[in-house]
């Protein structure tokens, strides 16, 4: 069996640049690329429609909603793994 390397696309949804900056070192570009950072639920919904992500990190609460409904919708409608951080 041949091992194939894979990179995972990541969407980070957070109102805080501090959170995004603290998570980025945990996501090396060799394994996680591209990493997209958005700052609102509405922007995240637009990105999810346009791009298929493997992993979605939601740092709740967000300015326009808590984030739970977004997490449920992404889990229901895509194959992405979702982590809701409160």
Q: Could you tell me what each predicted segment is?
A:
Residues 1-25:
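Non-catalytic signal-transmission and effector/linker regions of two-component phosphorelay proteins
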Residues 3-7, 49-52, 76:
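Flexible, charged surface loops at secondary-structure boundaries
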Residues 12-17, 39, 58-62, 85-86:
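Structural motif
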Residues 18, 43, 65:
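Short alpha-helical
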Residues 25-29, 47:
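Alpha-helical interaction/dimerization surfaces of two-component signaling modules
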Residues 30-35:
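A generic structural motif
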Residues 37-55:
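Acidic, metal-coordinating helix/loop segments flanking the phosphotransfer/catalytic sites
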Residues 54-80, 86:
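Conserved phosphotransfer microenvironments
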């Amino acid at each position: 069996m041949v091992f194939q390397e894979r990179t995972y696309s990541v969407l980070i949804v957070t109102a805080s640049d501090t959170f995004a900056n603290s998570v980025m070192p945990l996501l090396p570009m060799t394994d996680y690329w591209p990493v997209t950072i958005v700052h609102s639920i509405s922007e995240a919904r637009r990105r999810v429609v346009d791009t298929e992500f493997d992993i979605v990190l939601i740092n709740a609460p967000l300015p326009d909603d808590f984030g739970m409904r977004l997490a449920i919708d992404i889990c229901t409608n895509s194959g992405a793994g979702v982590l809701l951080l409160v």
